[in-house]
Each structure stands twice: as structure tokens, then as C-alpha cells.
Amino acid sequence: MQKTSLTALARHELRHALSASNGRSARTVFGGHEHQLRQTLIALRAGESLSEHENPGEATIHVLVGRVLLRAGEATWNGSPGDLIIVPDRKLSLDSVEDSVILLTVVKNLGL
């Protein structure tokens, strides 16, 4: 069994994002290419975005710090600390309204 402090990791990654030229930092918390389930902690400086992209599989976004805006077509969802957003199965983008940290959980599509 492995235990990870998401609070400590969020602080660490947000510090990196704030000083990074692209305003973001990310770390895989669980999973990787050899797993179907992947959890990634993503820190974004206020005003930064994850540009529109395809949904990689079933996914959720757990907002740990700050405020974010998820866009999928005409639909939008606001996220604040403690919110869990079910990611729709379509192209989407994410805007960081404030300095933010999210935990992205994805189960990759197997193409079955």
C-alpha cells in the first residue's frame, strides 16, 4: 500500500507552476502507460488553460485548490475546492480562473 498527501503535493506542484514559463506543472500520482487507471495532479497559474482536446476516456476532475472552468462545446462547469466534475465524453478545455490544482482521474479507452 502507498499513501500520498495530495495537500503537500498540490502545494509543491503549484509552486512549480507559478515559476514555470508555461504556468503549469503536473505529476502522475497513480498509474502510467502500463495501467488503465491514471491519476494526475495538475497545477495551473491563474489565467492559464489546457487547450481543447479529446477526452482520453472516462474521467473526473477533483478541484483541490482555486477555481477552474471546464468547457465542452457550449456547456461550461465551474469548479471550486472540493468539487468533483464528471468530464463529458467530447472535446473539452479547462481554464484556471485562480491559481489552481486539480486531480484528473482517467480510465483510458481500450477501443473494444
Predicted feature locations:
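Glycine- and acidic-residue-biased ligand/ion/polar-headgroup-sensing regions
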Residues: 57-73
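A cytosolic small-molecule/anion-sensing beta-strand core signal
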Residues: 64-65, 80-81, 98
